[in-house]
């Protein structure tokens, strides 16, 4: 029995891939501008990329930013993401601070979904997952490679490991340098959904060559896709209008 993840009015893991747009503001003013802009678009989930925020180590500023996003996009589930530099983030955050910030965000009890990177200390990850679930938040365990696409077996291994840690959703995003890389990601997505995972999956081949993976989730098994309203957070992201039109077209002609 496949599980879905229900957050607010959004069900992740069935139907069309849900569209997520990141907020990338460096200041409270920029976050407010982006949140107000996003409120005019039709999409499903907002991701706050807190690694872009200049005051990410100031908990009072983090709370203010979350309040601004909630005021403008309160009907949307929010993902809190503190992306590390090694996985494509904006700034370096030491291991201890990474977990401390994520813990304090969860303790606000005002978060829907937390993104935790796979390649951190296992015990710390499990502790954070337990805290998230205690405070009513879902967890994405993610892995990103902005240089290459690992082998199919390695993708399967990483996502199975993420699921075994207790994730509600697992995510893999890798760089596609050629069409073979794209096929590797699509087939790994198919295998994970058909043979391994009972939870929602996000699978993306980044870059222009991997663009098809952002649209074909309903066919191959990826449950969330990322789009942009302003700035991009990863190579190959397209506008929310383009993504929505193509995802809806595929849905219409595959059901």
UniProtKB/Swiss-Prot annotation:
One annotated GO biological process: amino acid biosynthetic process
Assigned EC number: 4.2.1.10
Superkingdom as given in the UniProt entry: Bacteria
PROSITE patterns: DEHYDROQUINASE_I
GO molecular function annotation: 3-dehydroquinate dehydratase activity
Pathway: Metabolic intermediate biosynthesis; chorismate biosynthesis; chorismate from D-erythrose 4-phosphate and phosphoenolpyruvate: step 3/7
Keyword Electron transport: no
Binding site residues for 3-dehydroquinate: 47-49, 83, 214, 233, 237
InterPro entries xref list: 3-dehydroquinate_DH_AS (IPR018508), Aldolase_TIM (IPR013785), DHquinase_I (IPR001381), Type-I_3-dehydroquinase (IPR050146)
Active site: residue positions: 144 (proton donor/acceptor), 171 (schiff-base intermediate with substrate)
Disulfide bond residue pairs: none
Pfam family, one: DHquinase_I
Listed Gene3D superfamilies: Aldolase class I
SUPFAM superfamilies, per database record: Aldolase
Catalytic activity annotation: 3-dehydroquinate = 3-dehydroshikimate + H2O
Sorted UniProt keywords: Amino-acid biosynthesis, Aromatic amino acid biosynthesis, Lyase, Schiff base
Subunit field text: Homodimer.
Function comment: Involved in the third step of the chorismate pathway, which leads to the biosynthesis of aromatic amino acids. Catalyzes the cis-dehydration of 3-dehydroquinate (DHQ) and introduces the first double bond of the aromatic ring to yield 3-dehydroshikimate.
Classification via NCBIfam families: aroD
Family from the record: Belongs to the type-I 3-dehydroquinase family.
This protein's name: 3-dehydroquinate dehydratase
